[in-house]
Amino acid sequence: MSKTPIPCIVGFGGVTPAGRASHNLSHTRITYGLESEQNKKDYIKSVLSLCNMADEIGESQSFDKFAADKEHEVLKNTLVRKIDKEFIKEKFWCYDYDLPANGGGQLPFRLNPTEYYASRQHPKALGMAVMGIADAFSDCGFDVRKTIDKYGRDKSGCFAGCAVMNMDKFSGDGLMSSYPMGKRASSKTISFTLPEMTADFINAYVTGSLGISGHFIGACATSQYNMNAGVELIKSGKSELVIVGASEAIIMPPAFIGFDAMGAMTTDKRLKDLQTLLGEGEELDYTKYCRPFGDNAGLVVLSLIH
């Protein structure tokens, strides 16, 4: 009998345009019309809690009634939709930019993960990583930190990061635009730009891990590459527990400029041409920006951590 350890997934989580990934909540949003009433109710509550909207509940109103009243609003402010440009520009951009594409996978409502912990000008992707790992821990069914302490911190690994780079005003975009705009670059921006900073943050802020960590970049397959690295680390016996994933926050001008130059991205013009071709009218339906099957207009940018 082989003595090679068998890797097992013991929990998963994250934050996506559909909300929390743990407990299959994001999947519930995708299949919302086919879900049971209880699953729908649980999903709506999860988004309202995630976005800290429970404070809006009236004194004589129950959470169930509040969630029922907010159902349409939650569905409207999740998944791919028209980007809330004013919010993203204020929070994450260095300069205004006339977007060729105004649809994308923005996090639910105006969710800003960096406001949920003591961040110090942290890029959005790193804030998403902290929120995402907390969500994953809630899905495990056991105390992850105690397990890490039991195995030893040198036996806990982490492979996570982004495919492009961290590119908001607190990272890559802030670094590269500071000099042309007559501003001073922060001493943090170049380090926050590094793709593997997600793994570094999880180790430093969450797990206190001293084990093997790193990051493999593979475009759309980045999380899969990191998963493979984690599997091999456990099989080798070098780690007992490994955190793997990816964190992307690329609803930023540099990403739009790059993907548009490639001719690979869905734009308002391409969507309008496609809608005309399919007889769907001239008013742009931003919820149909992403069409993975059949006729489509290209890729769609989004923010997610998983």
Name the predicted role of every residue range.
Residues 1-164, 170-211, 232, 247, ...:
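Conserved "HGTGT" condensation-loop signature of ketosynthase/thiolase-family condensing enzymes
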Residues 191, 216-219:
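Glycine- and other small-residue-rich loops at beta-strand/loop junctions that grip anionic moieties
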Residues 223:
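Short conserved active-site loop signatures built around small residues
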Residues 226:
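Active-site histidine-anchored catalytic micro-motif
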Residues 238-242:
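Short, high-confidence coil segments that cap the C-terminus of an alpha-helix
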Residues 256-260:
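Short low-complexity, flexible loop/linker segments enriched in glycine and/or proline
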